[in-house]
């Protein structure tokens, strides 16, 4: 077991079940307890927004868990700027819902890892695709699937300017463990569908019917595979 200092964050909030599952993963991988800096409420879809014109409040839950009024990217900035400056890796998630293809540009989960990369810290964004009509998400199973993947990715040499994006599929409770597929992000844009009601426009696109390129992360995860994609910033 390594002695890496792992920083954990998410966009679903400090009390989210997915973040608790990610703590399980971190505790299996490193002998050092992880540091958690996460939003005090849900910031899903926050993208890479950061706070520079107003104050951020930080609530210390204990000596290694902090909740903040900031966005996911703010959480990483706060950590590296004072709460946990000696971080080795940034892990974000496990997001409730997929962050596949074009989602990486809107996801607060992915933005947190991207912010770490900008400051020279390697990272892994982790998400769990959610499909209607299937058994509830099993976060203990998600942690079990994710642990060997994160351990493997952390053991590899890091190329500055890159990060890993991992998506878990939503399969039935009785299904066999999914295969792991290394693949590219799907470049297809999300659907441009809106419904007009009383002068207001409501997004009406169906995430589960989104366009997809065969063999891409969207295609593979929707078919039941764990997808691992290397994302390059520069």
Q: Predicted regions span which residues?
A:
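A cross-family phosphate/adenosyl-ligand binding-site feature
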Residues: 2-6, 20-86
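Short glycine-rich anion-binding loops that position phosphate/pyrophosphate groups of nucleotides
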Residues: 12, 42, 71-72, 95-98, ...
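Short beta-strand segments
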Residues: 9, 37-39, 92-95, 125-127, ...
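Electrostatically charged, flexible surface regions
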Residues: 137-234
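Short acidic, Gly/Ser-rich segments with clustered Asp/Glu that frequently serve as metal-coordination loops
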Residues: 12-20, 211
